[in-house]
Amino acid sequence: ADAHEVLGELGVHFEAAANEAGAAAMLGASINYPLRGAATWKSVVGTNVASDALSNLSSAGVVGGAMIVIGEDYGEGASIIQERSHSFAQKSQIWLLDPRPNLPSIVRMVEKGFELSEASNTPVMLELRIRACHVHGSFETKDNVAPKHSRRNPIQKPVFNLERIPLPPHNYTQEKLKIDVRLPEALKFIQREQLNEFFAGDLRQIGIILQGGMYNTTIRALQQFGLADPYGESRIPLYVLNVTY
């Protein structure tokens, strides 16, 4: 709300939702229209509240990029029920982004996350773990880009597409599209944009595959054994999954 003037210039609509279900329902605009939308809440309880809207969104698929930014309150320092959002992503086939706790990495995953959503017609979750939410650093900004369609340039004709409604018989087609079309497109995009990262090390006998959000903790653990330094240089090769699912 404090960025109202900037958002107004760009035609971006901001709304404080009454709850997570209402916020997730707003993303439904991306189902039929090339409109990007983002919602944010604290997980996993907030994701429980939004689960109905998320199921409908993931089944129908999206034309515009749809991103759910979640605060993953799990692990050391957490303050709520200890469940993870990973299972929600798998259940609904929502791509789960778990960026390395490093500001340039997080910023890049926001940009590429929207592009991944559009390329695969699938909503994405960007989870920020406790350590990612407390990270310090800096990043290079880019110029703001106004959306093609907004309140300043509205879409003239409404779209009504029965195939986007998650009811029989279309829900069965949607389930097939998840595997036959959306998943292959997502994999191609992830590989082309190199969203996952590889860090080489001189010890080639073993390697570690880890989720992006675990990177800092892994480096710290390796440090204790003399296998990494404070600057993130690991002797053991690391394959970091910024796209966890």
Task: Please describe what each predicted stretch is.
Residues 100-245:
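Flexible, low-complexity linker and terminal segments
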Residues 1-104, 131, 194, 200-205, ...:
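Thiamine diphosphate
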